[in-house]
Structure formats: C-alpha cells, structure tokens
Amino acid sequence: MDSNNSKKGSSVKSPCQTPRSTEKSNRDFRVDSNSNSNPVSKNEKEKGVNIQVIVRCRPFNSEETRLQTPAVLTCNDRKKEVAVAQNIAGKQIDKTFLFDKVFGPTSQQKDLYHQAVSPIVFEVLDGYNCTIFAYGQTGTGKTYTMEGGARKKNGEIPSDAGVIPRAVKQIFDILEAQSAAEYSLKVSFLELYNEELTDLLAPEETKFADDKSKKPLALMEDGKGGVFVRGLEEEIVSTADEIYKVLEKGSAKRRTAETLLNKQSSRSHSIFSVTIHIKECTPEGEEIVKSGKLNLVDLAGSENISRSGAREGRAREAGEINKSLLTLGRVINALVEHSGHIPYRESKLTRLLRDSLGGKTKTCVIATVSPSVHCLEETLSTLDYAHRAKHIKNKPEVNQKMMKSAIMKDLYSEIERLKQEVYAAREKNGIYIPKERYTQEEAEKKAMADKIEQMEVEGEAKDKQIIDLQELYNSEQLVTAGLREKLDKTEKKLYETEQALLDLEEKHRQAVATIKEKEYLISNLLKSEKTLVDRAVELQAELANAASDVSNLFAKIGRKDKIEDSNRSLIQDFQSQLLRQLELLNNSVAGSVSQQEKQLQDMENVMVSFVSAKTKATETLRGSLAQLKEKYNTGIKSLDDIAGNLDKDSQSTLNDLNSEVTKHSCALEDMFKGFTSEAYTLLEGLQGSLHNQEEKLSAFTQQQRDLHSRSMDSAKSVSTVMLDFFKTLDTHANKLTKLAEDAQNVNEQKLSAFTKKFEESIANEEKQMLEKVAELLASSNARKKELVQIAVQDIRQGSSSQTGALQQEMSAMQDSASSIKVQWNSHIVQAESHHLDNISAVEVAKEDMQKMHLKCLENSKTGTQQWKTAQESLVDLEKRNVATADSIIRGAIENNEKLRTQFSSAVSTTLSDVDSSNREIISSIDNSLQLDKDASTDVNSTIVPCSENLKELRTHHDDNVVEIKQNTGKCLGHEYKVDEATSSTPRKREYNIPTVGSIEELKTPSFEELLKAFHDCKSPKQMQNGEAKHVSNGRPPLTAIN
C-alpha cells in the first residue's frame, strides 16, 4: 500500500530525514527477523490471520431525535453481535451478524481505542506493518472515529480524540519510556480524490497559493507485488505536537462539502501513515534498526445521490466514491471466495490497500453504521461487506531489520546527494533549495557526523566486549565437555543393566505363556473327543431305523410289479380288438366314396349350364353397348348441328351490323353535306336521322330478342335430346356392369355444366348488348368459343380417363341418372326464368334509349350554333367507328370459322374415342367369360377325388364307435387292476443326517487357531496380573482337566 512497505529495509535511512529518492538497491547484509521475538508463530504465518473487523454504531443525531426516528439496529457488546430488524412482507425478521468487537451508540472514543487499536500499536512497535481503516455510509462517523474533536490548546488529548491522535500519543509514550532506545518517526498524508492522488503535506507554490492547487502524484509498481507513491512528502517528527500540527495541516487541505446527510462530508479518501525506526543491539553486539508502519485510512462514505442531494460536481464526486468502494467490495468478495483473479487494479484505492487486503499487513476494519430506519439499506450493505471481510486472511510478516553498516552506507549516499544539491544551489545550476531546508540539512549533517563518530567508538567497545565474552564462553565449554563425558559413561552402564533385567523378565513371561497354551490345547482335544462319541451313538440309532424302512419298501415294489404284468397283457388284448374295429370303419368309409362321385358329376352339369347362361348374358351386354354407342353418336351430332346453327346466327348478326354501320356512315355524310348548304335543313336532317336511328335500334333490339329466342329453343332442343338419352340410358342401366355406368355419369355432368355455362353467357349478352354492340359480339363469340373448347376438352379428357375406371364404378349409374334428370329439369326452368328476366331488362333499356333520344332532340336545338366545330369531330369519329367496326366484324367472322373447325374436329375425335372404349369393354367381357370357363374346369378337376356315400358312412361309423366304447369300458373299467393299500409301507420322515460342515466342526481346530483364540480371550486384567499370579501360585495340575 505504500512505498516503505515495498522497499522495507532499503527505504530506511538514518534517524534524520529520509531522502525522497526512488532508487532501489539490493542489500546483502540484512539480519533475519527471526533472530528476535516474533509474536506470529510459524503455523499462524503459514495459515494466515483473519482481518479484525469492528463495528461501531453512532447515536441518533439531533434531527433524528427530533423526528423520533425508529431504530432498526441493536448492538450487544458482550456477545459481539449486531442485530438488524427488517420488515419483509409484513413479518418482522431479525438478521444477526457476529464480529470481533462491537461498540454501541453509548461507547466512548477511549473504549474503542483501548480495546481495538492499542494492541495494534504495540504490533507496529514490534516491527509489523498495520492498517486501520474506517468503512461505512456517509454521515456515520468515520472521520470522527479516525480524527475526533479539536485538540486542546495546552496540547492535551481531549476526551473525544480519535484513533490517529491517540495512536500518536501512545507511540511517543512507549518510545520515550524506553530511554536507552534511539528512534525516529516519519509521517505522510495522502488524499485520493476522483481517482487522483494528492500529497496533503506538500508545500504549495506561490503562484498557485490563491487557488490551492494540488499536484497529482503517480502510483508506481515496485516489482515485488506492492505499490509506492512517487514524490510523496515524508516529514520527520520528534514529538506528538509536531504530528498534531501535520495532521491539522493536511486535514485543512482535504476536500469536504455539506450534504443533506452530513454538514461536513469528506469527498475523498485519506491515508495518514506513521513510519517508525527503532535501533536495537543484537547479542553479538551488532546494531540493527527495526521498522514498523501504521496506516490510518479514512474512507469517504458511500452515499445515495437522491438522498444526499448531490448535484453536478458533487454528483460526480459521489459517483467516483461509490465506484472505488464498489471495487473494494468486489475485492473483498473475490478474496473471500478465493477467486483466481482479484480486481486490485480497477481502482487506485484497492491498489493502495492491496497489501492490507490479502497481503503481509495486519489489518483492522472499523465499520461505522447508523441505527436509523432511513439508512437500513446502507447499514445492511455495510454489515454484509464487513462480515465478508472477516474471512479474508493476511499473512503478516515482521519487516526485515537493517544492520549498522547498511545504515552507514545509506547515510554516505545521502551525504553525497546533499553535497550535490548544495553545489547546484551555489553555482545556480540545479534545483533551488529553501533556506530553512538548507539550514535544517546542515544541522542534520553535523548531528549525523557526531552520531557516526559515536557509533564508531561504540563499535570498538562492542568488539572488545565480544572478544571477552568469547574467551569466557570457550572456558565454560571445556568444563561442560568433561562433565558431559562422565554423564555419558554412567548412563551407558545403567542402560546395560536395565536391558539385562528386561531380558530375564521376558524369558520368564514366555515360559509361563507356553505352559498355559499347552494346557488349553489338551482341554480342547478332550472336549472334541467326547462330542464325537455322542454323535456316533445318535447316528447308529438312525441307521437301524433306515434299514427297517428299506425292507418294507422292497416288499411294496414286488406287489406293484405283479399288478403291472397283468395290466400289460390286458392292454395288448384291448389293442388287437381296437385294430379290428378300425379296419371295419375304414371299409365303410371307402364304400361312401362312390356315392360322392355321382354327386360331383351332377355338380359338373350345373357348371356347364352356368357357363352357357353366362355366354348369353355377355351377348346381351354387347348389344346394349352397341345401342349406347348409337345413342352417344346421335347426341354428339346434335351438338354439332347446334354449333353450326349458332355459327350461322352469329354470321348473320355480324352482317346485319355491318350493313347498319355502313348505312349509318352514309347517312352521316349526307347529313353533313346538307349542313353546308343550310343550317335549318341540317337540323331537320339530323332530327330525321335520329328518328331513323331510333327505328333501326328498335328493329335491332327486336332482332336480338328473336336471336335469343332461337338460342333458347336450341337449348331446349338440346335438353330434349339429353332427356331422351337419359331415358334410353335408364332402360339399359340394370344390364350394364359397373364400368359403363360411371363413365356415362361423368359425361352427363360435363354436358350439364356446358349447358349451364351457355345459358349464363346468353343472359350476360342480353344485359350488355345495348351498350356496346360491336364489342359485345366479339367478346360473346370469344366466350362461346372458349366454352365449347373447354366442354369438348373436358368430355375428351373425361372419356379417356374414365375408360379405365368403368369396370369399378358402373353400379352407381342408375341413381346418378335419376338425380341428374331432376337437376336438368330444374336447370331448364331456371333458364326460362332467366330468359324472361333478360327480355324485361331489354324493354327497360329500350325505354331508357327512347328517353335519351328525346333528350338528344332537345340538345340538337341548342347545338345548331356549334355545328361547324362538331362537323369535323363527327367526320373523324365516323371514320374511326367504321374502321373499328370493320376490324371487329372481320375478327368475329374468322373466330367463328375457327370455332366451327375446332368443334367438328373435337366431335370426330370424341366419336373415335368412344369406339375404342367400346371395343375395350367388349374385349374385357370376353376375357371374363374365358376366365369363368377356366374356373369351371378347375372346379371339376378338384372335386373328383371327394365322392363318397356319406349316409352309409355315418351309419357304419356310429355302430363301430358304439362297439369301441363298450370294449373300452369293459377293459379299462372292470378288468384293469389297481394296487390297493396294505398300510405296511413306511411313511416319509426326516433323517438327521449330519452335514459335511457339522462333521468338520467336530474336528479339533488347528493348534494355531486355538492359540489365537486363547490369546484373544484373555482380559486386560489377566494380561497385566497373569504373570505375577503364575509365578507365585504355579500352574494347575493336568489331572484336574481330566
């Protein structure tokens, strides 16, 4: 955490001011610290020492007392416990923490210091580096605990003095009490503000005196796992008052501010370090210097910005404070969990405290908390981190002590450095040194020279003293060697005598034990012999009983053999009789075969008649299919005629339209010629032309009505033809197979859909014809052509796809035909109703056109003045209409011709497909007939071996079965002998046959096992007293065992 910690002995100079040089040099003349008393044992050093954690609770402040704020914290100083009351989900829950020491709100500064801090000061004087830092929320008394109240003018320590002044006073009291000891103290005061290090003891430069600017310091690694602050000012102090002045000087420079939680809140972390050097003499007379360091850290408190009221710069300060404290908490967690990575480098605070947390420094944490309920969350956080910090282990080590020669060398290098500074100041070539410092350094040099001279004199005296002590030591060593030789001889003789006595006692004990073992073996052998005799008598009785039972069993076996011989002869006789009966039964079965042959001949005749009937039915089916083909051809031809009529009507309609358009064009030309001669004549001609157009449109409407009537008649004729076709199909439906019925059903559905689409097309044409005559005819022809093509293509595809499935779907044709009849009739009625609706719509359109004509006459009167402009537009319009109408009419005629050609080719293709389908049907029927004939032949060849007279067989079979039953009952029921009980057969009983294991158990165990059991059964008391008893009483005689 500090530079002295990392440098250890190399940073210690003389009792005067230590130079602020950053040079490090290795020393080969260190004295091992283990030569002096070390309060840390080797075991403790290896395992580590837990950080000491102390909790202090502040009392309520005036504001909290005025508001009567409830307390949530209870401190038990005796049990060292802190209990926090929480209200979670309406339940009162207490959380208890256990710490090393606990100080309640009523505790005094002196109590905390004497119980917790005072032992640490003694460890610092023993050569350890120790750290004490206060941790907690802002406003909980950290600075008060570390620094306390203002010092009295007379220099006495006030009652509310904190840890720092009391520790300083204790150090000087102890050092001054050791009058013979020489010592020196150095202090440094460091501030960490917004992650920048500042030396609070550095002298301020004149030009920055007004704004109190503070130069930031650099934090450097020392290469040994520690850190040091480059350029940190260290002041030599010789009295406690000087330290108090230094403390007041640095505290005045610390950054503080007022917040809602604290009137004087510290906005930075501060580290006050006291370094002590004490000179000691070794038993060899060598002068060494031991060093210890006390770091007193006052951390800025964590705060909630919303509660503290921090804004802008204060908010940034609070953020930096919370960030560094959060990193400190993460370091504590990582150390407790023994994590592989400890985030020391994430904050300068944790880098400075690195040796205090998990390092070689003894550390004490004073956690300050508030009892107020408003600070419950912060209090719990502080207590949780403090409780975790308890488990952090440090491995404190005593600082290495420096020999006098090392100090002398450092002093010489310091003198050389000071000489260079003086020379540079004299020549004005270097760094300026203040007069006060120059005077002080000169005085220190003189004092140092005097001390060096004094040390040399003392060194010579010590050398003489060491020589005298060495001579005394050598003489004492000679006397001790003579006494040690005599003692060794006496001890050797005593040892030999004791060994001889032990050998004799061992031999006597072994002899007594051997006699007891032999007696124990003999007693076990006699016991085994007696057991064997008793067991042999029991086995002799069991053997006699078994012999009697065996004789009775042999007698019973003889009786059973006689009965078995008689039963064997009886069974042989029964077998011969049974064979004779079975032979008779076989003869009767053979006689019945001839009768069954006659029955099978009759069956063959029946099959022949079946085949002939099947042939006649096939011929009838073939004729029905021929009639079906003729009817189908008739329907297709009628469709062809309908299409031809439709084509003729369309051509005539188009020709009429063309003539009307031509007439209309001529009339327009004549009318416009008349207009050029006279406007009045033009108006009359226009009116007459309009009348002519009205008449022609009426005639055209009547013509379209007649055309639609003819189309409706054609549709009705198609419906009549289809109805006749369905009636004819119904008469032959029962004679057709499954194949023809389904194909015709599909064709009927296709024709029905075609008729429906055709009627819908006619209705649509009637609605649109009055609006656009030429465009309607062209689209009508196109739709008609498309409908016919779709219908013909569907019929063709249906005929080709359904031919293969006719043999599986024919049975459902009759029901489908009847349902289609009903649907066809309904379609006819619906088409007629649609025709009537269309006629009424045409009449309405006619009335609308008449109205429009009247309106046109009225408009013509108002357009007389604009006839010149309209003449040119009408002429152009006439030309465009004539050209458009001609192109439309020619396209319609060409489309009708193509439609006629495609329709005829489709009909011829359909007829050829139907012929091929009929041929395939007839071929399949012939194949079926041939298969029936083959099946009849196979049946005749199979049933020939099965002819037999079943009636005679049944009669003879019954007689033979009755006779066999009678013989079986006589043989097995009356003549078969049974073994009767004589009550002389011995009953089953259990024999006590000894097992191999039980026989083995009767054997006497081996001598080794007996001896082992003998030794195991001896009690501790017998083992202790047995030898003495045997020696005094002797062994018992063997006759007593027998």
Curated annotation (Swiss-Prot):
Location of this chain's protein in the cell: Cytoplasm, Cytoskeleton; Cytoplasm, Cytoskeleton, Spindle
SUPFAM superfamilies assigned: P-loop containing nucleoside triphosphate hydrolases (SSF52540)
A Pfam family matched in the record: Kinesin
One cellular component (GO) term of this entry: microtubule
Outcome following mutation: residue 280 to K: In rsw7-1: Disorganized cortical microtubules during interphase and massive disrupted mitotic spindles
Biological process annotations from GO: cortical microtubule organization; cytokinesis by cell plate formation; microtubule-based movement; mitotic cytokinesis; mitotic spindle organization; unidimensional cell growth
Reported phenotype of the disruption mutant: Radially swollen roots without any depletion or disorientation of cortical microtubules or cellulose microfibrils.
Coiled coil, from the record: 480-517
UniProt: ATP binding residues: 136-143
Gene Ontology MF terms in the entry: ATP binding; microtubule binding; microtubule motor activity
Name of this chain's protein: Kinesin-like protein KIN-5A
Organism of provenance: Arabidopsis thaliana
Gene responsible for this protein: KIN5A
